Amino acid sequence: MLAKLFGLGKKQQSASLAKERLQIIVAHQRNELHPRSSKISSHLLAELKDEIIEVVKKYVALSEDNIRDIDIKVEDSSKNSTIEVNIPFN
């Protein structure tokens, strides 16, 4: 009765609710980033491609045609996932 009166039970409920919400957020982020649990989102794939281009440009000259022809494939299997990147350059 006193716990109810002073709201002591609410703290446990709030903690449980916060924990549940945090678990949902973490699971959502894992699904977005982990290829085996879901496909990589097109936004994440585009961002990955842009970053790869910037790194490759540090070492190799790429023309606009080379950049346009970059091919990224994501393959999933039961054991692992792979990202294959093909970058044509002269």
From Swiss-Prot:
Alphabetical list of NCBIfam families matching this protein: minE, PRK00296.1
SUPFAM superfamilies membership: Cell division protein MinE topological specificity domain
Gene: minE
Family of this protein: Belongs to the MinE family.
Protein name: Cell division topological specificity factor
Pfam family, one: MinE
One biological process term in Gene Ontology: regulation of division septum assembly
Keywords: Cell cycle, Cell division
Job description of the protein: Prevents the cell division inhibition by proteins MinC and MinD at internal division sites while permitting inhibition at polar sites. This ensures cell division at the proper site by restricting the formation of a division septum at the midpoint of the long axis of the cell.
Record's keyword annotation contains Cell division: yes
